[in-house]
Amino acid sequence: MADRSVRPLRHLVHAVTGGQPPSEAQVRQAAWIARCVGRGGSAPLHRDDVSALAETLQVKEFAPGAVVFHADQTADGVWIVRHGLIELAVGSRRRRAVVNILHPGDVDGDIPLLLEMPMVYTGRALTQATCLFLDRQAFERLLATHPAIARRWLSSVAQRVSTAQIRLMGMLGRPLPAQVAQLLLDEAIDARIELAQRTLAAMLGAQRPSINKILKEFERDRLITVGYAVIEITDQHGLRARAQ
């Protein structure tokens, strides 16, 4: 049942990318699944909910570099970032690729838990971090005893998966520069994109040199500035025009 539930999203990713070597496919799948993290308006829990669940939520502290959860391990609960930053990455050493950064208020682990999927990336603390953890039993009890929260949580999951699918479909048939511009706009938090070029290339099913060339063109036109594993948008209106 769980495998059938996630198959449409996997097929959609394959259709957009055309299928690539396993390592790049792994980065791509993890990156797009990481787009389904609960964030901002799509987060399933409100501030009042977290306060009401104080006795249920476990507080866990992580030093910089500490592993929060491992790729391929069975999802055993839901993580809510309280303080600090959590890096989501696949691979190791030189093959390692960062696919997302969790910020305070972000929620992860709920979709793999509901679908009985393993985690597809490793979460590691970038800074001193505090997370709230809701284990499987507590999560199931929460959904069973708080109908309003259960409805909002299911709506949140549906919204996140739908948004990810719409983004993927929106890439079809567009020139690569327009795809890159749109991806940067979608991924920006406070005008910053904290992803390596390899991850951006994998998400679009493109070669890294092609992405690098486009980013240099954008930088030359003063739309962005490019640093190590970070891109800053300096002209949002101009970049949005390139995405059309």
UniProtKB/Swiss-Prot annotation:
GO terms for molecular function: DNA binding; DNA-binding transcription factor activity. Keywords: Activator, DNA-binding, Transcription, Transcription regulation. Residues 197-216 bind DNA. Residues 174-237 form the HTH crp-type domain. It comes from Mycobacterium tuberculosis (strain ATCC 25618 / H37Rv). This is HTH-type transcriptional regulator Cmr. The keyword tRNA-binding does not apply. CDD domains: CAP_ED. One of its GO terms (cellular component) is cytosol. A nucleoside 3',5'-cyclic phosphate binds at residues 41-160. Positively regulates the expression of at least groEL2. Cyclic AMP does not affect transcription in vitro. Disulfide bonds: none annotated. One of its GO terms (biological process) is regulation of DNA-templated transcription. It comes from the Bacteria.
